[in-house]
């Protein structure tokens, strides 16, 4: 859990914003959402593999667009 030390004469809103940002960077909310319901190991592997395929296709598409601009 991220911790934020409140500085002297620092407004609460600013400290809260820093805390939210540190939680976002640490991935706390994403972790909570992923652990909200049990996911079978096979379903998790399948989801991660599908995400990897999607990322790869996106990368290939970006590379093709970049090559088209060069000519």
Curated annotation (Swiss-Prot):
Bias (Basic residues): 48-59
InterPro entries found in the cross-reference section: Ribosomal_bS21, Ribosomal_bS21_CS, Ribosomal_bS21_sf
One cellular component term (GO) for this entry is: ribonucleoprotein complex
Entry-linked PROSITE patterns: RIBOSOMAL_S21
Presence of keyword Ribosomal protein: yes
Query: Which one GO biological process term can you cite for this protein?
Result: translation
In terms of Pfam families, this protein maps to: Ribosomal_S21
| Molecular functions per Gene Ontology | structural constituent of ribosome
- Residue numbers spanned by region Disordered: 48-71
Q: Where is the composition biased (Basic and acidic residues)?
A: 60-71
Keyword annotations: Ribonucleoprotein, Ribosomal protein
Superkingdom of this entry's organism?
Bacteria
Query: Of which family is this protein a member?
Result: Belongs to the bacterial ribosomal protein bS21 family.
Q: Which HAMAP family match?
A: Ribosomal_bS21
Q: What is this protein called?
A: Small ribosomal subunit protein bS21
Question: Which gene carries the instructions for this protein?
Answer: rpsU
């Amino acid at each position: 859990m991220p911790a934020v030390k409140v500085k002297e004469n620092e407004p609460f809103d600013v400290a809260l914003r820093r805390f939210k940002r540190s939680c976002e960077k640490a991935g706390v909310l994403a972790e909570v959402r992923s652990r909200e319901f049990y996911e079978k190991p096979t379903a998790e592997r399948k989801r991660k593999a599908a995400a990897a395929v999607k990322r790869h296709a996106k990368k290939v598409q970006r590379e093709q667009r970049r090559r088209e601009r060069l000519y």
